[in-house]
Every structure is written in C-alpha cells, then in structure tokens.
Amino acid sequence: MKINLSKSELEKTYRLLDTKEINMSVAELLFSIFEEKEFFMGAKSPFEFYGKLIEYWGVPRDDFEELKILEKWVKGAISPLNHAFFENNSYFKTVNPVPFKQGDYQLGYDTFKAYQPFSLNDIEVDDKDCYLERSPISYFTSDEKYLALSYKGEVWMSITPNEINTMQPYIDQASGNILVLGLGLGYYPFMISEKEDVKKIIVVELDQNVINIFKEHILPLFPHKEKITILKGDAIEYLAKNKLHYNYIFADLWHNPEDGLPIYLKLKEIEKRYTFGKFQYWLEKSLLAMLRRCLLTVYEESLQGYSVFQSPLT
C-alpha cells in the first residue's frame, strides 16, 4: 500500500531518511577504521586523528558538503584516553589472572597500541535532529593491555573501554538481588558485587567452557565472590520458568547490536509478562537505533509503493 503525505510531511520524511542513510554510512566508516587500525596510529592528537579520517574516507579538502557531514557526525565525538582509565578501575586493579591455554581457548592480554582507534561508548542519538547518531571514538596515548579470552585465535570476549563505559549506568543503578543473563569475563558481576546494597547475583550462562574458565581463573580473584551464583542454562528458557523475584535483570547476550537485535526483541516480549524487576539491556541505545533503521527502511519502501512482502528487488 502506497502512503500519501502532504508536502511538509514528505519533506520531514526525506530528512529522516537522508539522516538514516548518513548514519549507516558513518557507521560503516567507523567499523572499517577499527578493522584497519594501523592507518591511524601515526596521529598524535584529536586534530591529527580527524585529518586521518578525512584522508581515509577520501574526502577532497574542497568538498565542503562531505566535510560538513564528518564535522557534524564524527569530529566532536573524538576524545583520547590515558593509562589512568584502566589504572583507576577496580576490576583491572583486582582481576589479573595468569594467562593460560586450554584446547581452543586462551585467556590472556591483548594490547591497544598507541593511537589505535576504538569505540568508546554507546551511540548518542539526537532525537531533535532526525535521530542523528554519533558514535564516540577514542584511542590511548600509550600502549595499554586489557584482559581477553580468545577462541581458535580470535578474540571472543574482552574488557575494553567500550564495555566499561556502556555498562557503567547499569552498575550505578544496581541494588538488591540481580539476575545477569550472560557471563562474559564477569566485569558487570564484579562491579556490582563491590556495592554494599547488592545482596545476591545470579548469572545464567549457556556455555560450560566459559563457566569453567571463569570459575577456575577469574572468580577466585573476586573479593565478594560469595554473592555470585552461576547457573548453566539458556537465558530465554530460564526467564520463562523463573519464579524468583529480582530487583534488576541485566541482559548481556550479544557481541554487537547486529546479532543482539533478535534476542533483544524476544526479551522485550518476555519483559511484558514480568510484574517485578527492572529489565536492562546492554547497548540498548544501539539496539534501538538498529531497529529504527529497519523500520525507516520498511517505511521508505512503502512510500515507493512497495509492501513489506514486496521487495523492490523482486
């Protein structure tokens, strides 16, 4: 069914759709710079880093329209970090397991090279400017090590500035009895176990290998490990059968918004049936941005006369 809009409504709609396209293009650009990090390591300041971005994107210095996009979407979101970021974090001060290798799994330390770009935090969305998305990015001014678990030579789980920053709002809110869906390297359970007003933490994790590694090499280093109980199981199935009351339910079952969106939508349906406990979702702003892009794409096709079941490619 084709949608008919007034001229002013159509103008607003096209601004939304144009912003969505730029959001997606900038997101692809940022993903690519994290993959080709060596290109940016010569930068020594946010200004030089921004210049590298312009060079990487291939924007001519006289292309003011493209430069304006970079200025608006990216430049203000760049901020460097130093050693104090990790040095002052209680997890990093306390949890320093001895590296080991067991089968396909290896627990050890990876390194951010000086001026290597990375994602710093969840996206910032400006709902007053057509849902413009800015992704904070950063780099360290010196080489910095961080804990990582690799599987078959690929980093699978790690404790990075992005994980630290994106979890902090949920850590600040935590109190009482907490249900955690997904274990990882235990950053969130560790941080909330340090709080006096957090009494009990139940973690549901499906992967027995992850549980074993955590229990043997990481949990013994926790000062308040007595607060933490780990259950092997599927998070969705556990929620369907659960009879216990929790103050907060924190979901961390995905590596990124792309693989997390289907699980997030399932959990939102389950949340409707819970009369207790506040549900919280890691990277929720990014998950909602991903959903918004999908809905705007469907809406755009409807404007062009396509239905949800009729792709313009068929």
Residue ranges and their predicted role:
Residues M1-F140:
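N-terminal auxiliary segments of SAM/dcSAM-dependent transferases
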Residues E144-L147, P161-N177:
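Conserved alpha-helix/loop element of class I SAM-dependent methyltransferases that forms part
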Residues S175-G186:
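Conserved class I S-adenosyl-L-methionine
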Residues G176, K199, N247:
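Conserved acidic residues
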Residues L185-D197:
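Conserved SAM-binding loop of SAM-dependent methyltransferases across substrates and taxa
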Residues K200-E205:
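Conserved SAM-binding motif I beta-strand of class I
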Residues D207-Y248, N256:
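S-adenosyl-L-methionine
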Residues H255-T314:
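C-terminal substrate-binding/active-site "lid" region of AdoMet-derived donor-dependent transferases
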